[in-house]
Amino acid sequence: MRHARMAIGKGEVVCIPTDTSYALVADAFNPVALDKLRAARRMQDRAPLSVFLPGIPTLNALAESVPEEVEALATEFWPGALTVIVRAGETLAWDLGDTAGTVALRMPANRIALELLSETGPLAQSGAFALGQSPLVSPTALAKRFEDSVSVIAAAGDEKTGKSLSTVIDATSLDSPQGKLRIVREGAISSLEIFRVVEADRFA
C-alpha cells in the first residue's frame, strides 16, 4: 500500500481492486494525474471522471448539498456498488472534465481501496477495462494491458472483486421543486433494492 500511496502523491496512476472490478485511480486534484488517467484509459481529453471517496463525511465535503434521499441511499449502500451524481461544491479546486458542475461519487466496499482512500483522500477513477469490453480481473492481464501507463497494481489478494458495474443514480434534479431522482444505470444493486430505501415515486 505504501507504494500505491507514494505513486498517487507523485501524480501517477494506480490500479486498485474494488468490490465491482479493478479501477484506475489518480489524485482528483492533480490535473497532470488526471490527464495520465485519461490517457491510460484512452479517453478523450475532457471526458468526465468519477470519484472514489473514503466515507460519507467526504460526500458532504464534496457535494454542494446532500439531499435526504442521497443521504439515505449512501447510508444504506455504502460502502458498496452505488454511485450517486450530485452537484459538486463550487469551491473545489479540481477539473474532472465536462461534468457540467456535477460529480459522480462512490465509496467502494473493498478493504484495499478504502485503506488507500483513507490515506490519500478522494481519488478520480475509471474502470480498468476498455469501453465495450469485460473488466479485467487478473493482475497479470492488468499489467499487460496497462504496463506503460500504470505505476502500481494492487492485487486483490483475499478481497473479492468481480466483473459487475455499480448502480448509478442521478440526484442533480433534486435542487428544483419538482425534481426527481433518475436511475442512470442499474448494476449490482437492483432498482427493487433502491426502492426499499427511497420510494419509487421519487424517481423519474
Model-derived segments and spans:
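Active-site-adjacent structural elements in enzyme catalytic cores
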Residues: M1-A204
